[in-house]
């Protein structure tokens, strides 16, 4: 009687392992970029949260109001998130009136200074995204940004 052997040969298993290794070589860097982009987006969310504070400061004719003072009820000009710190900066320019002009107010976002700074992607740690606020209230990437272009969210990316 002839016995039938069923299963995979060693060479077939080695080929499968090699294919998985090749796929992983492409997938891991792409996944790391995806994580860095998602963490970078948190900074823009923090900046959006500062829009109300900027508007309140602009009523006094300035971008950056007083530092936080809980005793007097003054809210500060910075927000800390999980991966980033966003701070209001700049000098208000009242002469700018067109909706697409920067009004002089900026938000500086520094990555790696959040509450979970040890968990941030090494691709964006210590990098800075500067956002200029436009007269219409939206943000656009400003000068002084050293965050790699591929990690800057499209909503604020400067047109080139």
From Swiss-Prot:
The chain crosses the membrane at residues 8-28. This is Fimbrial protein. It comes from Dichelobacter nodosus (Bacteroides nodosus). Pfam families: N_methyl, Pilin. The pili are polar flexible filaments of about 5.4 nanometers diameter and 2.5 micrometers average length; they consist of only a single polypeptide chain arranged in a helical configuration of five subunits per turn in the assembled pilus. It is found in: Fimbrium; Membrane. It comes from the Bacteria. InterPro entries: N_methyl_site, Pilin, Pilin-like, T4P/T2SS_Core. It is a single-pass membrane protein. NCBIfam families: IV_pilin_GFxxxE (TIGR02532).
